Amino acid sequence: VAHPFHREVGEGDDRDVLGHAEAELAQRADGPEGDEVVGGEDRRGRLWTIGIRDPRRPGEVIALLPLEDTSVSTSGDYERYFIEDGVRYHHLIDPASGQSPSGVHSVTVIGEDGLSTEAFSKCVFVLGVEKGMQFIESQPELDAVVVDAHGLLHYSTGLLAPGLQTRQ
C-alpha cells in the first residue's frame, strides 16, 4: 500500500520517506503485511487517499482509494516469494492443496478493524477472485480490491463510486 506522501507499506517492509508528514494520520498501525488505519481528514480537510501497489511494477500504484476512519490490509505474492522452474511460490498457502494460489497477485480489504481486514485479505487471496469476492459481498462491513493473475482489477460493489481512480 502506498500513501500520498510516498510512504510505502509493503509486506514486511515499512519505509517513511517524509517522516513528519505521517504525523497527520490520526491513527496508524504498522503491521507486517501492509496494514494501515486511517482516521480523520488530511490537513486540507479531504479524505485520505491510499494507493494500492502494483504487484508486478515495483514503485507504481495500480489504484487510489479515498478512505475515512477505516482499516486497510493488503496481502500479495510479490514480497515473500521465489521462482523455481517458472513457478512462483509465495508465503500464502491454500490449506486444501498445500500450494501457493496462482490466480491472484494482490488483495486489499477495507473494513472496521485491522485484525479482521488482515485475516480476510489472506482468506480472499486463497479463495481466488470469484469465491473471494462473493465472500466480501456477503459481508456488508467489508470492501475489497483484487488484482488477478492477469493484472485486472476487481472491486467490491461498495467501492464502485466516482472517487475511485485506477491506472489505465
What are these regions (language model features)?
Residues P4-V17, A21-L25:
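Alpha-helix boundary/capping motif
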